[in-house]
């Protein structure tokens, strides 16, 4: 008998939302009113502000927040239950404890010392409210997705011209020394992964005895890009099945003349992992709901993964899967309640946030197989598609590759990347981009509003200059103020 696609785990979840009115958290992805649980309520039902001594009321679209100090800035580090290790856990470096941050009420300077929003920066503050975000469902149309996965490889071809990097300023270190530059770092240290979890969401789990072909088709049918793998023999989660695995299947098939595609398709997931990925896959990296969002950001960027399972510390059950996009959206929504750092008004070119050199690109005339080679070798999640003049004409992501399975066209990897983009069910008009003169605040607002994972940095003639990704932004807002560079580690 074939195992079910959605594996039901024994046991009862120990983490659940209480039924009281103070804890009925509206999931913004499932509810039409775009409501989130207030982080102040999620971590402490009542929070006394350091300045005026008033309570912050529950925050939704229908309720206004009373004027108060931003949550998490006026008190010491919160005591939380220690996270129990259920899988491999990342080692997190020492960051500035929240208790060492100077409370606003005790500072000798006035509130203007936090570098609040200047009048000339008011335009970049637009779109910071939840009303500007199109927050609908957890899994939007697959064609609008970009892949967020990892990959492995050897040889990389060199398609496309080498883009010119903009002249970068050296002011980012100076900005981090200004008062208020650590406000987002403290916010993410103060709140836990439980705060960012949805009240209700879809979670697809595969048993390792499932055939790999059926698993990939199930991912397409359910609109997911990754699924936890359950080993019934070990009675534990052993990893994640991602689109990277599908890319590796195609890559091995095309690069090995003696291997037939149907032979790989009929393999079980456990066979694929043991034979074809021998020595390549790593133990599952997970996190506890008690751990801070700061640790979640570090684990995602440090391990170069795009899915971080939240495991129950007692039962080991997967409760939720955190992503870069979920964390930035959480920070973007509640960041409107925090003092606005001055660096949000600085331009991308001045701050140097993003990737500007040694960019992975692909020519629109190159075959899809060339794009697969770059995905495997460079471990990137998307490739800017350029023409012979170096102008950006599209964006080919890892998730576009799995469309080959949905359309039964994965035997035709010799088609051009441009043709593959035109065959997508959903044809996107243009490429979401930004320019060097735009401020960091404007870029963050656009990424959150459009629900994308990156913006392509171009000049006035649409020539490629760089890429600004979610990892770049989270590194700058959360980890850099703590003196941590997880991107280069």
Curated annotation (Swiss-Prot):
Binding site for ATP 2: 225, 307, 325, 397-400, 424, 432, 453-454
Stored CDD domains: CBS_euAMPK_gamma-like_repeat1, CBS_euAMPK_gamma-like_repeat2
Domain annotation CBS: ranges: 197-258, 280-340, 355-415, 427-486
Binding of ADP 2, residues: 225, 325, 397-400, 424, 432, 453-454
AMPK pseudosubstrate, short sequence motif: residues: 293-314
Amino-acid positions noted as binding AMP 2 in the UniProt annotation, renumbered to this chain: 225, 325, 397-400, 424, 432, 453-454
Keywords per UniProt: ATP-binding, CBS domain, Fatty acid biosynthesis, Fatty acid metabolism, Glycoprotein, Lipid biosynthesis, Lipid metabolism, Nucleotide-binding, Phosphoprotein, Repeat
Binding residues annotated for ATP 1, in chain numbering: 225, 240-245, 285, 306-307
InterPro entries (alphabetical): AMPK_gamma/SDS23_families, CBS_dom, CBS_dom_sf
Composition-biased stretches (Polar residues): 32-47
Sites where the protein binds AMP 3: 306, 355, 360, 381-382, 453, 469-472
Any one of the GO BP annotations: fatty acid biosynthetic process
Record PTM: Phosphorylated by ULK1; leading to negatively regulate AMPK activity and suggesting the existence of a regulatory feedback loop between ULK1 and AMPK. Glycosylated; O-GlcNAcylated by OGT, promoting the AMP-activated protein kinase (AMPK) activity.
Residues that coordinate or bind AMP 1: 240-245, 285, 306-307
Binding annotation for ADP 1: 240-245, 285, 306-307
GO cellular component: cytosol; nucleoplasm; nucleotide-activated protein kinase complex
GO molecular function annotations of the record: AMP-activated protein kinase activity; ATP binding; protein kinase binding; protein kinase regulator activity
Domain remarks in the Swiss-Prot or TrEMBL record: The AMPK pseudosubstrate motif resembles the sequence around sites phosphorylated on target proteins of AMPK, except the presence of a non-phosphorylatable residue in place of Ser. In the absence of AMP this pseudosubstrate sequence may bind to the active site groove on the alpha subunit (PRKAA1 or PRKAA2), preventing phosphorylation by the upstream activating kinase STK11/LKB1.
Physiological role: AMP/ATP-binding subunit of AMP-activated protein kinase (AMPK), an energy sensor protein kinase that plays a key role in regulating cellular energy metabolism. In response to reduction of intracellular ATP levels, AMPK activates energy-producing pathways and inhibits energy-consuming processes: inhibits protein, carbohydrate and lipid biosynthesis, as well as cell growth and proliferation. AMPK acts via direct phosphorylation of metabolic enzymes, and by longer-term effects via phosphorylation of transcription regulators.
Quaternary data: AMPK is a heterotrimer of an alpha catalytic subunit (PRKAA1 or PRKAA2), a beta (PRKAB1 or PRKAB2) and a gamma non-catalytic subunits (PRKAG1, PRKAG2 or PRKAG3). Interacts with FNIP1 and FNIP2.
The protein's name in its UniProt record: 5'-AMP-activated protein kinase subunit gamma-3
Organism in which the protein naturally occurs: Mus musculus
Species classification: Eukaryota, Metazoa, Chordata, Craniata, Vertebrata
Gene name of the encoded protein: Prkag3
């Amino acid at each position: 008998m074939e195992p079910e696609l959605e594996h039901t785990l024994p046991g009862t979840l120990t983490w659940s939302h209480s039924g009281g009115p103070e804890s009925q958290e509206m999931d913004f992805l499932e509810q039409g009113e775009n409501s989130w649980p207030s982080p102040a309520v999620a971590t402490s039902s009542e929070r006394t502000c350091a300045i005026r001594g008033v309570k912050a009321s529950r925050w939704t679209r229908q309720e206004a927040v009373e004027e108060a100090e931003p949550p998490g800035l006026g008190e010491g580090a919160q005591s939380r239950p220690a996270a129990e290790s259920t899988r491999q856990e990342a080692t997190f470096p020492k960051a500035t404890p929240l208790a060492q941050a100077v409370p606003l009420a005790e500072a000798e300077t006035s509130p203007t010392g936090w570098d609040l929003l200047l009048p000339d920066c008011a335009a970049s503050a637009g779109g910071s409210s939840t009303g500007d975000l199109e927050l609908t469902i957890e899994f939007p149309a697959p064609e609008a997705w970009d892949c967020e996965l990892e990959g492995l490889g050897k040889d990389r071809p060199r398609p496309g011209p080498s883009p010119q990097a903009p002249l970068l300023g050296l002011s980012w270190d100076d900005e981090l020394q200004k008062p208020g530059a650590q406000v987002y770092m403290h916010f993410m240290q103060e709140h836990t992964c439980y705060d960012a979890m949805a009240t209700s969401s879809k979670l697809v789990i595969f048993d390792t005895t499932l055939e790999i072909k059926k698993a990939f088709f199930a991912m397409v049918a359910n609109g997911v890009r990754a699924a936890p793998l359950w080993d019934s023999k070990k009675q534990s989660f052993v990893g994640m099945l991602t689109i990277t695995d599908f890319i590796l299947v195609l890559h091995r098939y095309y690069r090995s003349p003696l291997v037939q595609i149907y032979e790989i398709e009929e393999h079980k997931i456990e066979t694929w992992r043991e034979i074809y990925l021998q020595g390549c896959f790593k133990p599952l990296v997970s996190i506890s709901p008690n751990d801070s969002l700061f640790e979640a950001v570090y684990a995602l960027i440090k391990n170069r993964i795009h899915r971080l399972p939240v495991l129950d510390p007692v039962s080991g059950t997967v409760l939720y899967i955190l992503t870069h996009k979920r964390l930035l959206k959480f920070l973007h929504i509640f960041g409107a309640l925090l003092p606005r750092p001055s660096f949000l008004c600085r331009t991308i070119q001045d701050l140097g946030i993003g990737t500007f050199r040694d960019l992975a690109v692909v020519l629109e005339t190159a075959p899809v197989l060339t794009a697969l080679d770059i995905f495997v070798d460079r471990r990137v999640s998307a490739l800017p598609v350029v023409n012979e003049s170096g102008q950006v004409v599209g964006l080919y992501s890892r998730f576009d590759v799995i469309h080959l399975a949905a359309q039964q066209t994965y035997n035709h990897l010799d088609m051009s990347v441009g043709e593959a983009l035109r065959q997508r069910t959903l044809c996107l008009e243009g490429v979401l981009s930004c320019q060097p003169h735009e401020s960091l605040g404007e870029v963050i607002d656009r990424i959150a509003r459009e629900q994308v994972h990156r913006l392509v940095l171009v000049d006035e003639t649409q020539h490629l200059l760089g890429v600004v990704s979610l990892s770049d932004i989270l590194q700058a807002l959360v980890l850099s103020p703590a003196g941590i560079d997880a991107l280069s580690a």
